[in-house]
């Protein structure tokens, strides 16, 4: 093991890099395996139109099974610094990046079970840690730093909260998702996201599902989630239909809109008049 710059011990394994605190490592493997609620996988995104998505779903019937919950509505409340440091760093495509969010399935109320998630990406491998609690408990934990059960995951979340000063709700995202998993390998999953909405006001999972659309109605964001290789039938479909991976990020797309609007508000129009005594001088300003 070796200590990395984020304060965690890293363990090289066949599947890649796992990250744990030095204190937790001393507790031994049995505790490590029993307590963790960690997802480790590669996530590959593709932008499809509705026709392509339906063609793929039809072909998937032979190899995959629809999730028993069917179409679900996912709400994610992303936390960031006042100057959006986390998403700005993420958009620079660093070797390591992380996001902190609060997730619910549908609109929550104070007693709804929600998930505090710390999503990390290291060398293209995604590590997601999450803990379940009520929406009220999550709000008091993330905003007011009230104590919760001490686990490896909460320590990593605490480290994130301490490392990035003044983290608070920044963007609310919601979308409808269809999920499928392979019949012979439940770790291979495909999801289809539509009706992706965002807002940077009313920042609560309890406020409802509304906001501005990120994608055209004809577009579908597909994510392939796997701990191994993509099956050949899937590779053939993508090749035949000229579908290529994309680095599309819901949060980053919303942030670009926020940033562009802030720039327009802080920038004078391209041409404006400056009055200097009896003279009128036209200025051409480029933002």
Residues covered by each model-derived region:
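Extreme N-terminal basic, low-complexity initiation segments
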Residues: 2-9
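Phosphate-end processing signature that detects enzymes handling 5′-triphosphorylated RNA
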Residues: 6, 15, 19-287
């Amino acid at each position: 093991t070796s200590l990395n710059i984020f304060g965690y011990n890293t363990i090289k394994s066949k599947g890649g890099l796992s990250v744990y605190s030095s204190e937790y490592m001393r507790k031994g493997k049995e505790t490590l395996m029993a307590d963790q609620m960690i997802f480790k996988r590669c996530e590959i995104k593709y932008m499809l139109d509705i026709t392509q998505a339906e063609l793929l779903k039809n072909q998937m019937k032979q190899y995959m099974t629809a999730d028993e919950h069917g179409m679900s509505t996912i709400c994610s409340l992303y936390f960031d610094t006042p100057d959006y440091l986390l998403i700005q760093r993420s958009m620079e495509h660093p070797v390591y990046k992380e996001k902190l969010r609060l997730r619910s399935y549908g609109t929550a109320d104070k007693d709804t079970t929600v998930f505090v998630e710390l999503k990390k990406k290291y060398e293209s491998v995604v590590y997601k840690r999450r803990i379940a609690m009520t929406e009220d408990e999550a709000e008091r934990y993330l905003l007011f730093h009230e104590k919760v059960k001490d686990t490896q995951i909460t320590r990593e979340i605490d480290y994130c909260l301490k490392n990035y000063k003044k983290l608070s709700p920044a963007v609310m995202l919601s979308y409808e998702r269809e999920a499928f998993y392979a019949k012979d390998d439940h770790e291979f999953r495909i999801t289809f996201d539509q009706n992706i909405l965002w807002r940077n006001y009313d920042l609560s999972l309890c406020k409802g599902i509304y906001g501005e659309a990120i994608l055209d109605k004809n577009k579908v964001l597909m994510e392939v989630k796997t701990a191994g290789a993509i099956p050949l039938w899937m590779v053939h479909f993508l090749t035949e239909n000229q579908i290529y991976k994309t680095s599309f990020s819901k949060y980053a797309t919303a942030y670009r809109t926020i940033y562009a609007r802030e720039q327009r508000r802080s920038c004078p129009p391209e041409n404006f008049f400056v009055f200097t005594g009896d003279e009128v001088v036209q200025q051409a300003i480029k933002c």
